[in-house]
């Protein structure tokens, strides 16, 4: 390296003498200067080994960022809004403003990467500070002036312990306060928080990884050349953009409906690379020109002028917590054409973008056949439920404690008499309005009361519109529920809630839950618009709490559909069991007319809810899942044909699914287990242990763990899955096959926190464990092996310090 690139060379002996004198002087002046004296701030050895050839971002830098940095810096809740999942996120830098702020009085300006600003200069105007030195011309200054480098260097200078828990004072809680220092503030930050370099609260980078990142930063953080779309992919993009940009009123209305439901998706072309995805956006430029996205808070916001629907390659890394894939294919295109264009109907005018119309899909899309709309949603029901599980609304208790820890979802058949009666839905559209039409406001009590009245009017009008001969025999009532034609696995879903995150799987998984949702078209559509299309993560406290309160109403309606299937004599007992404790009166706000009227007859036992679940499992047949023992068919069910290691591990873990009681409160909500077989790593087995916490009710907005409020620890249990489930693992366990029975026995023997700590010390992978990254890498690779299209980078923000 040229002498012009850094201070003049100093012989080692003289350097040590000078460094000692400088350190002594600095010690007399201020402890901060001693902590971060100049020789420590920059790695001269790495500057001396700086390669002449540029470090390639895509092939050399991005894999390191994805495996070590994106695990925490990948979404709205990335610390300091520093999104390291894309080069543009690094160039944008960080911000002291937080996205998730449920108490703000005024809505915040949106800061969505690739949408709300397109250049670094625009982000600076929005208050983002650089983490790269954007002006430096020599390697030394590029490092010394880079907050990102200084964070990495701080961790090198102050590595964390190699055993035990993290040092006191390091907060890894979800709502921890972030410092987000600028370059001018960094010396103070490093002095006050010397053990909070990057990776934060996790082991250091490997030397080769650290060297690659430092060399890349010293070279000026060059980016790779933009990728060119493969010809076959470009052809499919052109086909879909042509379909979405038709000029007739019918084509434009259908395209708007599709956009407002798919805007959050990771669109994948069948037959292409499993890691290639696109996003559907509105652009001011037509197909064939560079995309210029139109930034509106919500997908139904007024575009303000002419626009085109465009498919944009999904930029950046695929992150599990916001990855909701949706397949595009020639067959899908043909199906959509048949669904929306081979039905006889007319569109006389396009709906406005005024909030009271645009936020109400029953008004905006009244011209589209109800059967087509509902069929579109049912075909990929998991995608639309995942929208609110993985969308911006997903983070935190205020959003998710409206749901149970595990419950099933089923759907009414689109061809049943009530579901196919579009006339009454059109007539009741005004009653189906939701608080999202008011956007940001602080009228919490009056808003809740207003929309609750609309809900009751809707339910009463719906009762009058139901032309069913009641009561129905059980077999006929079961026929009103969709079975997916016997082939569509979206006919039944299981939702797992993990305190402040959640996940969705196909099938009825685990033991029969306390509650289930039976959804019809109006419910499914309202959930999407309330929690996905209409939810603004940058909105004020009024918007966020009104959203949460109204979701309570929708959840109760969905659960009431289950109650309607039960005999009248048990409904109140079941209903009251869902709403105990401090919120016992809340459900009385909605009083179903049928609570004392038998609607379904033919039960043969004194446990009708369990009997109903048994019938549902039988009706769905292979579409319901029994995780352990694993499903099999033919010779595969012969124990001699199944690997002995798999049988041994499955038999051991099956015992955990029968665990009950208060011990669960000591366990992580989501734990990943790797059973090491001793051969190739990819042959090892993966399990997920989910804690199903029991609650007196799920209607309290806050105070998740206040004793006596909502928790009923005696009803806690475990769900064990022979695959990886969840985007936010809270702990890893690595178990040799030879110890799998011991692992289960000790797990089953946990009675208190001390027992759990001893168990963790033997089998767990703590944040301080030098093998932590090896474990994380294996689980990320395993997720890709299990689901090549659906998998994304796991998020470690919720990983516990135990």
Kindly label every feature range from the protein language model:
Residues 1-10:
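N-terminal secretory signal peptides that target proteins for export/translocation
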Residues 4-5, 24, 258:
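Residue-level detector of alpha-helical transmembrane segments in integral membrane proteins
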Residues 9-11, 22, 148:
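N-terminal non-cleavable signal-anchor helices
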Residues 13-26:
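Bacterial N-terminal signal peptides
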Residues 28-802:
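Aromatic- and Gly/Pro-enriched helix-to-coil junctions and flexible linker segments
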């Amino acid at each position: 390296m040229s002498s012009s690139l850094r201070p003049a060379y100093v012989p080692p002996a003289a350097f040590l003498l000078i460094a000692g004198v400088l350190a002594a002087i600095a010690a007399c002046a201020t402890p901060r200067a001693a902590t971060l004296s100049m020789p420590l701030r920059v790695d001269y050895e790495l500057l001396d080994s700086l390669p002449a050839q540029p470090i390639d971002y895509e092939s050399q830098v991005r894999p390191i960022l994805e495996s070590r940095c994106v695990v925490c810096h990948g979404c709205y809740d990335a610390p300091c809004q520093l999104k390291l999942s894309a080069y543009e996120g690094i160039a944008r830098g960080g911000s002291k403003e937080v996205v998730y702020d449920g108490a703000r009085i005024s809505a915040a300006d949106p800061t969505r990467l690739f949408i709300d600003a397109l250049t670094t200069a625009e982000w600076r105007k929005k208050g983002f500070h650089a983490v790269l030195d954007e002006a430096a011309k020599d390697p030394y200054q590029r490092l010394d002036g880079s907050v990102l480098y200084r964070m990495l260097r701080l961790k090198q200078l102050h590595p964390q312990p190699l055993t035990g828990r993290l040092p006191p004072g390091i907060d890894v809680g979800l709502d921890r306060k972030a410092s987000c220092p600028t370059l001018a503030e960094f010396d103070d930050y490093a002095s006050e928080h010397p053990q909070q370099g990057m990776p934060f609260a996790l082991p250091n980078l490997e030397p080769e990884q650290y060297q690659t990142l430092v060399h890349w930063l010293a070279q000026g953080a060059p980016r790779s050349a933009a990728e060119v779309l493969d010809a076959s992919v470009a052809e499919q993009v052109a086909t879909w953009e042509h379909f979405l940009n038709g000029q007739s009123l019918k084509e434009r209305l259908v395209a708007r409906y599709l956009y407002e439901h798919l805007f959050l998706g990771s669109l994948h072309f069948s037959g292409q690379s499993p890691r290639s995805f696109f996003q559907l956006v509105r652009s001011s430029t037509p197909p064939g020109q560079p995309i210029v996205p139109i930034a509106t808070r919500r997908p139904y916001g007024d575009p303000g002028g002419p626009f085109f629907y465009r498919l944009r390659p999904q930029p950046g890394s695929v992150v599990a917590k916001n990855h909701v894939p949706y397949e595009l294919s020639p067959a899908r295109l043909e199906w959509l054409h048949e669904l929306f264009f081979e039905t006889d109907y007319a569109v006389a005018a396009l709906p406005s973008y005024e909030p009271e119309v645009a936020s109400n899909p029953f008004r905006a899309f009244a011209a589209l056949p109800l059967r087509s709309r509902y069929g579109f949603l049912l075909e990929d029901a998991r995608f639309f439920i995942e929208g609110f599980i993985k969308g911006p609304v997903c983070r935190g208790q205020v959003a998710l404690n409206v749901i149970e820890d595990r419950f099933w979802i089923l759907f009414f058949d689109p061809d049943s008499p009530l579901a196919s009666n579009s006339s009454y839905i059109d007539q009741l559209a005004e009653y189906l309005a939701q608080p999202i039409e008011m956007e940001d406001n602080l009228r919490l009590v009056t808003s809740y009361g207003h929309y609750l009245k609309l809900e009751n009017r809707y339910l009463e009008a719906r009762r009058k519109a139901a032309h069913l001969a009641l009561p129905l025999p059980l077999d006929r009532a079961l026929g009103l529920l969709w079975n997916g034609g016997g082939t569509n696995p979206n006919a039944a879903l299981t939702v797992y809630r993990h305190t402040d995150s959640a996940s969705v799987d196909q099938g009825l998984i685990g033991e029969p839950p306390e509650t289930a949702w039976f959804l019809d078209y109006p419910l499914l559509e309202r959930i999407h618009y309330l929690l996905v299309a209409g939810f603004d993560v940058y909105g004020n406290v009024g918007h966020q709490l009104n959203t949460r309160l109204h979701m309570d109403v929708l959840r109760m309606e969905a659960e009431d559909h289950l109650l309607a299937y039960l005999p009248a004599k048990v409904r109140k007992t079941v209903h009251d069991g869902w709403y105990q404790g401090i919120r016992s009166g809340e459900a009385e706000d909605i009083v179903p007319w049928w609570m004392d009227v038998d609607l379904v007859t033919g039960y043969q036992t004194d446990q009708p809810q369990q009997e109903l679940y048994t019938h549902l499992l039988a009706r769905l047949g292979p579409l319901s899942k029994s995780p352990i023992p694993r499903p099999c068919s033919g010779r595969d069910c012969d124990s001699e044909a199944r690997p002995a290691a798999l049988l041994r591990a499955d038999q051991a873990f099956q015992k955990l699914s029968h665990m009950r009681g208060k011990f669960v409160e000591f366990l992580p909500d989501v734990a990943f287990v790797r059973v090491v077989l001793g051969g190739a790593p990819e042959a090892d087995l993966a399990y997920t242990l989910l804690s199903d916490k029991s609650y007196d009710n799920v209607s309290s907005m806050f105070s998740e763990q206040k004793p006596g409020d909502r928790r009923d620890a005696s009803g806690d249990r475990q769900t064990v899955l022979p695959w990886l489930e969840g985007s936010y693992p809270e702990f890893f366990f690595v178990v040799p096959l030879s110890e799998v029975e011991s692992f289960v026995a000790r797990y089953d023997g946990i009675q208190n926190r001390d027992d759990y700590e001893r168990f963790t010390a033997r089998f767990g992978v703590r944040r301080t464990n030098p093998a932590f990254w090896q474990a994380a890498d294996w689980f990320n690779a395993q997720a890709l092996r299990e689901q090549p299209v659906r998998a994304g980078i796991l998020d470690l923000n919720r990983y516990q310090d135990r």
